[in-house]
Structure formats: structure tokens, C-alpha cells
Amino acid sequence: MRIALGIEYDGNGYFGWQRQAEVDSVQAQLERALSIVANEPIGVFCAGRTDAGVHATGQVVHFETHAIRNEGAWTLGVNANLPDNIAVRWVKEVDDSFHARFSATARRYRYVIYNHSFRPGILRHGVSHYHGDIDADRMHQAAQALLGEQDFTSFRAVQCQSKTPFRNVHCVNVTRQGMYVIVDIAANAFLHHMVRNIVGSLLEIGLGNQPLTWMGDLLALKDRNQAAATAKPHGLYLVDVTYPEQYQLPKLALGPLFMLD
């Protein structure tokens, strides 16, 4: 049978999602826990591979198993065998047409900036700290140039392996909640480092170092070297993955938990 899971994790301390030799990863920990509960080797497929230090509240995975367990047994059993910084949020049996990556129609990320003169202590691994005077309204206005299907060469990592630089950004909003500035962006898919590269350039606009037209200018240039530095990983969360209604997957609060939805 094929099982889908919704999981959340704190990416701090992991070398990203993907299983790698000799370093710890979220995928390796999840597969280990699932294999214990299923009493057989389990391999998982995810909706989106996150980088080192990046978090998720809405990651979706699927796996194949011969084990017969109810949803409660999967949830409780796997959580009991996972580290405290990874948790299963929901479990659902799905038909064989479902694929966590290829069935997804959109991914949504939130990037959380702690905009204060002093660095955070408790949330140091859950937000990115920038101390300058950030104009969130200015960032939001500039970000609208990203909407639609466009060539995002200026915002892809040099090592990105995607065959095409084109992605379709469905929506992007930048808002302020007290000391926090949140960049909320959804697209059909994202290039390697695309969200963090976009945030890095939006910050330059929010700090007044670049004009409002800069995002559009960067898109036209199609040159990663012309854009700003990549934003830090700690503030980034994969918060939601969208699938066709036929799969009837659970929909939970987006998170992260310390933010108001």
C-alpha cells in the first residue's frame, strides 16, 4: 500500500532533507523511524527537498509498505522513534497514482525575519535576524514583479540542476507583524535557493539600498551575479503543498507556530 505523511521539522542541525553518506538528514531519520514501525526497509519521496538549516511545517512525503497499520499506529509509532525536532502531523493511505513530488501543483514558503536592533536568543534558529530599518510595504510592492511564469535565472543557485529556469509564481506577499517581517510566496515549484535569493534582493529594496523596480530589472538581466546575496537559511519554512482535491489530504494551520495565521 501507499501511505502519505505530513511532517514538520526544525532543520537546524541537519544537512538538509536529502539522505547523504556520513551526515545527518531529515530523510534518514524519517526512514529509520518508519522502518522500525513497518518492520521492513522504507524509502520515502518528498514534495520538496529543503536545504541545511531550513524548516518545514507542511512537508509531504509518501512511501510504499507491506505493513498493515492504522493511522494512529503509524503516527504514534513513528513519532516515538523520531528525534524531538521531527514530527508526523498526519497520516493517510492514498492510491497508487499519488506521488508527493509529481502530484503536487504548488508549494508555499514563508520566510520570517526578526527585525530588531538586538539578535534573538530563544528563536535564533527559527528566524533570520536583520537589524536595519526594513520597509515591508516597499518589499511587497517590489515583489509583485515576480508574479506569473518567468525566467528566474537571476534567483537560482549556480549549482541548480533544474533543466529550465522558468517557474510560475502564484502569489507573493510581504507583511509586518510587530518585529517580524514575513515573506509569503507560492509557486508551482521553486529552483534551488530561489526563495532565499528572492528574499535577499527584496531586503535590499526594503532597506532602501535599491529602487522599487529592481526585482523586475534583475529578472530581465538573467544573471545571478547581479542580484543580492542569498538570505540566511534559518528563517525559511516550507509551510504548505497543494494537491488535487481527489486525494483529500488533510489541511492544517500553516505555521510556524509562533506566528499568527
UniProtKB/Swiss-Prot annotation:
Its EC number is 5.4.99.12. The lineage of its organism: Bacteria, Pseudomonadati, Pseudomonadota, Gammaproteobacteria, Alteromonadales. The active site is at residue 51. It comes from Shewanella baltica (strain OS223). HAMAP family: TruA. It comes from the Bacteria. One of its GO terms (molecular function) is tRNA pseudouridine(38-40) synthase activity. It is an enzyme of class 5 (isomerase). This is tRNA pseudouridine synthase A. Formation of pseudouridine at positions 38, 39 and 40 in the anticodon stem and loop of transfer RNAs. Belongs to the tRNA pseudouridine synthase TruA family. Homodimer.
